[in-house]
Amino acid sequence: MSYLDHCGVYVKDLENSLAFYKEIFGWKEKTRWTSGEAKIAVLDMGKGLMELVQRPGSPGAPPGGNWTHLAIHVNDFTDKVRKLEEKGLELRKVTMGEGAHIAFFKDPDGHTVEIMEKGLSL
């Protein structure tokens, strides 16, 4: 069976992005390395990995990028919303059919992130 192993995103400031995702989601840093001028760190999300890549001139979320958003299933939706609001982030909250709650926000690099109580795979 095939599955998604990790997603990789460009970031402007590796340390800032690591701190953001660790604080909001409690993810742990799995490893980090350099490749040429690139600094790379991998976060363990529990059921998959997120690779953060900082290169000289990394744009963060490129205008008109090739992906729309990163969707993250959380067990503590209300707590995550509270943490994000405390950080001053603007949230777009939506209630889907059957009472599933989701919220969209921008991470420090402008990537659209979705948090959800019930994932598509559940």
Locations of regions flagged by a protein language model:
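Residue-level marker for the onset of beta-strands and adjacent loop->beta junctions
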Residues: 5, 39, 68, 99-101
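Amphipathic alpha-helical segments
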Residues: 13-28
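Conserved short beta-strand elements that form part of the metal-binding/catalytic scaffold
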Residues: 28-64, 112-119
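Residues at or immediately preceding the N-termini of alpha-helices
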Residues: 14, 77-78
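Vicinal oxygen chelate
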Residues: 30, 42, 81-122
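N-terminal beta-strand motif that seeds the catalytic metal site of vicinal oxygen chelate
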Residues: 1-15, 67-72, 119-122
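Short amphipathic alpha-helices within nucleic acid-binding modules
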Residues: 20, 78-83
